[in-house]
Amino acid sequence: MRSVPLVAPRRLELVEAPLPEGPRAGELLLRMRAVGLCGSDLHWWAEGRIHSTPARYPQILGHEPVGEVLAVGEGVTGFHVGEVVSVEPSLTCGHCEFCIAGRHNLCIHARFQGGPEAPGFLRDYAVIPAHNADRVPAGLSVQEATLIEPLAVWVHVYELEPVRLGDTVAVLGAGPIGLLGIAMAKQAGAEMVLACDRVPHRLDLARRMGADGTALMGERDFRELVMDLTRGRGVDIVYDAAGAPETISQGLRCLRPGGALVLIGIPEPLEFAVDLHAALARELRIQTVRRSNHKGAQAAALLAAGRIPTSLITHRMPLEQAQEGFEMLHSYADGVGKLVFDFDLKG
């Protein structure tokens, strides 16, 4: 089968790999149909690490997969050959205190498919635990269904720090995660959603996803826009999807007293300064987010109902062009929003 491992920083190679063994009891064998490219994939590719965790070469990236069921392992119910499924990429133990409490995303034994611990899905076939699969609703294309995994992160975010009717919201960073966050906030009843990014075409996408106001970083001060449009009050919630030290600091300054800063993006530097006095003086809440928590079914339902636009998907590429796809997204070329590797396309 085809596989595209990361073999060095900024270098993917198309190779032939053996088929996976299985499925064993409780597992599904999938033929991959499409995989979305995520910002965390770019961190592995560009920097060779996430936080202090180094890549382990060869490492197969890709954790926003959609596949077709080819075989069903013994004891599996609810799935049939030929069905199309999305995959929750975190392999959890099911018996630690956090799994037992229903907080699977905090599992102390978790292995993440696409990280150094377990291969991701930039390959033709994969075997997964059946309980990590979510059926793709009728009417969603395989390309659109790659949004289930990142949207599931937002469903989990809303368990922790939801938008309430009439809230004002700022989204920092208008990459794919930020764009989904804009749409989620509008669906949740936000009165106003403001967004910023340093890439002009991403702000066009932000407006298409529902942003009421945008600012290009480096051209207009985002806090000035926020204070102008909220009459000096500040927003109720800031969702930071950029993970840059400057956006995190800016997010704190954009909040009203008692507001909440939610950190979703992955910071590139291992250490950086944040003015916590700004948070203490106004009793701000700071909430971090780790992945999702088996929220794929809810995310799929939102997409199937048409409540979240899928127009952020701007590019499809065959698996053979994975290296070019990573380079495109890293350089923000060609107006790219969300890029999907479509396994049915020929390279």
Language model features by range: what are they?
Residues 131, 140-220, 224-225, 315:
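Mid-domain Rossmann-like dinucleotide-binding core that forms the NAD(H)/NADP(H) cofactor-binding site
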Residues 3-22, 39-71, 86, 107-119:
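N-terminal glycine-rich cofactor-binding segment
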Residues 1-3, 249-252, 293, 297-347:
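C-terminal hydrophobic helical "lid"/dimerization subdomain
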Residues 161, 204, 208-285, 344-347:
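Glycine-rich cofactor phosphate-binding loops and adjacent beta1-alpha1 units
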Residues 38, 89-134, 138:
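Cysteine-cluster motifs in flexible loop/terminal segments that predominantly coordinate metals
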Residues 20-35, 50-97, 137-139:
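Glycine-rich beta-strand-centered segment in the early N-terminal region that forms part
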Residues 260, 273-312:
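Rossmann-fold dehydrogenase core element
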